[in-house]
Amino acid sequence: KKAKAETEQPAAKDSTKSSMTEYKKLLKGAKTIDGMFKVHIVKDKYYFEIPKDLMGRDFMIASRVSSTSNNKDIAAGQMPRNPVLVTFSADKKKIYMHKKMVRNLCDTTSNMYAAFQRNFSDPIWEAYKIESLSPDSSAYVIDMSSLFITDVPEFSPFRSENIMDVLMKRKALKGSLASSKSTILGMKCFPLNINIKTLMSYTVDGGPFTVTMTRNIILLPEEIMRPRYGDSRIGYFDESKRFYTEKKDGLQELTYINRWDLQPKPEDLERYKQGELVEPQKPIVYYVDTAIPDKWRDYIKKGIEDWQVAFEEIGFKNAIVAKDYPKDDPNFDPDDIRYSCYRMITTPIQNSMGPSCADPRSGEIIQGDVLFYSNIIKLLHNWRFVQTATVDPKVRKAVFDDETMGSSLRYVAAHEIGHTLGLMHN
């Protein structure tokens, strides 16, 4: 036995030495960025070093327009497509990126669970050659550049056509990618997420079209938020589920509502249980775009924080807070999925929107945005004039005073923030 052990040890050393040589050769001259994954930049290639202990973990990939040459359909700040839930697996030669299928669920203690697994496996979305192992063999090195600079439908800057396009016979903007005019601009890596910025050029009807896209890869928590079932009598955005079980007669159609996960701090738990108001571990923070004129921002912040009284009803004070975009934080990026933002969009469209991004496994809202369309000022002016001018002398003029318009913008802010909290129109 001793002799056998002595003959096996040099082989292990040779394997480690080989991995080190291969690793150094592949990444010679690389610029390395540390974070959730190490990213090694070698010329125009971006090598991701994915730890083996993250195989099988759930990630979300979101794609947002950061700038655009044509905001006909999608404006800067919007996500044209829903984020994608993915997980990674590996064999000896490749890393596989699977689309995680979470709509269908099954009781794991049920006899039918084996059949469920056979019928609802996670499909392979992309596959990448393992270029090398890390020197200690704890991570795989793969080239993921193509995911960000090719025409991947899930990351497209063009929105999908909807029923209104069909009914109104309007055409959504479409185009073909001009690869020679597209490139990765850079990456930022953090402990739980990576941001990738790309310049994407397309040929569309009427000429060229260029966008800067920000792709976010975020590691989702292993322990998911406890879902709350939807009720059709209460208007929440939700995640549709199908639950297979032998404990009920037939398939169950369920919904998980989209909601923020507010929890008391451990040291405040007993006070919270006694009915005292406490601050949550992680308050909901909205960053207000400094491109919004100064005279409107305070009204908008008040509209955001008008929701504080609602959270006080469930035991939390200062649960929702409004702040300006940070001036001196180099890591702040409104397109980073960690930040909820109230964004200014310059457009002739008279509108405002409050989309949010939720973990489809549980309905937990991860991030919300309000898109403040600049020309909503005109809409608010017309609404208030038509609806209240007979009783309100302040609105019988071509230009409202700041207080009158500010109060209208406060109303819009409260309305749109309600959407980002998961609430639909009532």
Regions found by a protein language model. Name each.
Residues 302-308, 363, 411-425:
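Active-site recognition of the HExxH zinc-binding catalytic motif
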Residues 2-46, 51-292, 325-380, 384-402, ...:
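Auxiliary tRNA-acceptor-end handling modules of aminoacyl-tRNA synthetases
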Residues 55, 295-319:
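Zn2+-dependent metallopeptidase catalytic core
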Residues 315-327, 426:
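Short, glycine/acidic-rich hinge or "gate" loops at secondary-structure transitions
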Residues 293-300, 304, 402-410:
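Solvent-exposed, acidic/flexible segments
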